[in-house]
From Swiss-Prot:
UniProt keyword Ribonucleoprotein present: no
GO cellular component, one term: plasma membrane
Species per Swiss-Prot/TrEMBL record: Salmonella typhimurium (strain LT2 / SGSC1412 / ATCC 700720)
Regions of this protein lying in the Cytoplasmic compartment: 1-10, 59-83, 146-163, 231-243, 330-361, 416-433, 484-500
Organism phylogeny: Bacteria, Pseudomonadati, Pseudomonadota, Gammaproteobacteria, Enterobacterales
Annotated protein name in UniProt: Inner membrane transporter YjeM
């Protein structure tokens, strides 16, 4: 059957990377936190983390293009199975938690599109509280996603393409409207250009700036998720590396350019110093400001300019909903594929590794859907205790999601040392360049994770959060080691069973 399964084009792969990595909301958040002084930190994060890490992924992906297991296969073939399983299991677990939160979050942009504002806190149906209504919608969303995704990679690629196009269109609107405003206003920027100090009084201390560096580094995360799609890509020996390199360059330039353009239409002191502005609504406030400023530049009446602003916010809501949808489809399948199809089949019950007619591990996908749905219902209907439990889960996933970058970067020199691989794409041609790139990425990711853990302690003496963040990777590692040890014991007791 496998020869009938359609593969993804280069454009499809680029759009998938774009929806997985480029969060349109990251540039408004950066402008809100740091103004123009965010740009040097974004460039720093791209040069010292994102671009070298993306190039490592491109080399590994093109060399291991026939492997089904994504990052698990890469680490397994470079270092060893136990190392690979712990890193991949930790990464997969944190994406399950990501799905729990995002399935509920996705309704905010949807509500903004339909009603012109976030009304999710006012949704009451049949005596249910808003949190419970959103929880039920999130479960329905999970079921719909799994139902469509189980029908094949082509369905996922089509949806992520729509998401990727929506994000690109938002960026295009930002670019074209900002240029139009500049021309209409005689080249005048609403925000004074200053790359060294933040207009936000809360971001003047060294500690706050370091926390922003972490924010910038994490904005570039997610490219490893497309690793599981190498074998689903057309001509992967050429297209996979091309797709990653092209997407990495566009994303790196895109973030800094987007931050720069926000200052054309929005003055930080006038619009963003209001206490009602927060990281949850900043994207819609900035897009509304962009529309209103365009209306004013075109000499429309104040009411008409405000209406333009409201419609800009609505269109942003729709585009963000589509972008979330695209990311959700990729991330509901790719991490699961790495952990199920990459690892030895004997690790899992037989139905979990069985592929349907479309080449998808449908049973495993439905089990994941049930697990995520149970978590959502527990958090939505469990009251304060469940809410506290969810906050702790999120803290546990905080570090667990990015620690696998360390596992992957540390596996890279081992991958380069192998002499038996056909390498269609090689960028790091010397041992020195390999070690420098690995060292820089490892140092940057280690700093980001260590700082994330100690920040609550330094700022508020909050040891509880710090311990939960340390506990996450430890818990997921111990669970992975227990699963792997159980497999090893059964394998040594009955080698024939393991080979089945």
């Amino acid at each position: 059957m496998t020869h009938t399964i359609k593969k993804m084009s280069l454009i499809g792969l680029i759009l998938m990377i774009f929806t997985s990595v480029f969060g349109f909301a990251n540039s408004p958040s950066a402008f809100y936190l740091m103004g123009y002084s965010a740009i040097p930190w974004y460039i720093f994060s791209a040069l010292l983390f994102f671009i070298p890490f993306a190039l490592m992924m491109a080399e590994m992906g093109s060399a291991y293009r026939k492997e089904e297991g994504g990052i698990y296969s890469w680490m397994n073939n470079s270092v060893g199975p136990r190392y690979a399983f712990i890193g991949t299991f930790m990464w997969f677990s944190s994406y399950v938690i990501w799905m729990v939160s995002t399935a509920a979050k996705i309704w905010v942009p949807f509500s903004t599109f339909v009603f012109g504002a976030d009304m999710t806190q006012h949704w009451r149906i049949a005596g249910l509280e808003p949190t419970q209504v959103v929880g039920l919608l999130a479960v329905g969303w999970m079921i719909l996603v799994t139902c469509v995704a189980a029908r094949g990679i082509n369905k996922i690629a089509r949806i992520t393409a729509v998401g990727g196009i929506a994000v690109m269109c938002l960026n295009l609107v930002l670019l074209l409207v900002s240029v139009a405003i500049l021309l209409l206003n005689g080249g005048h920027f609403a925000q004074e250009i200053n790359f060294t100090s933040s207009p936000n009084p809360g971001y003047h201390s060294g500690l706050a700036m370091l926390s922003f560096v972490v924010f910038a580094i994490f904005a570039y995360g997610g490219i490893e998720a497309v690793g599981g799609l190498v074998d689903k890509t057309e001509k992967p020996e050429k297209n996979f590396a091309k797709g990653i390199v092209f997407a990495a360059i566009v994303i790196s330039i895109g973030y800094s350019l987007a931050i720069f353009l926000w200052g054309v239409s929005t003055n930080w002191q006038q619009i963003l110093s209001n206490s009602a502005v927060n990281l949850g609504n900043i994207t819609y406030i900035l897009m509304s400001s962009l529309g209103t400023t365009l209306g004013n530049a075109l000499n429309l009446s104040p009411e008409a300019a405000m209406t333009v602003g409201v419609w800009f916010a609505r269109i942003t809501g729709l585009s963000m909903f589509l972008a979330y949808t695209g990311a959700f489809f990729t991330l509901s399948y790719s991490p699961l594929k790495a952990i199920i199809q990459g690892t030895p089949k004997a690790l899992w019950p037989a139905p979990m590794t069985t592929l349907n007619a479309n080449g998808m591990p449908a049973t495993a996908m439905w089990l994941q859907c049930v697990l995520v749905s149970l978590f959502i219902l527990l958090v939505s209907f469990g009251g304060d205790t469940a809410s506290a439990f969810y906050n702790k889960l999120t803290l546990m996933a905080n570090v667990s999601m990015t620690l696998p970058y360390l596992f992957l970067a540390l596996a890279f020199p081992f991958f380069k040392a192998r002499q038996d691989l056909e390498r269609p794409f090689v960028l790091f041609k010397t041992k020195a360049s390999t070690l420098v790139a690995t060292g820089v990425v490892v140092l940057v990711v280690t700093f980001a994770n260590v700082f994330t853990i100690i920040q609550p302690v330094i700022e508020a003496g909050d040891w509880d959060s710090a311990l939960w963040m340390i506990g996450g990777p430890i818990f997921f590692s111990l669970l992975a080691m227990a699963i792997y040890q159980n497999y090893s014991s059964r394998m040594s007791a009955d080698p024939e069973w393991a080979a089945e």
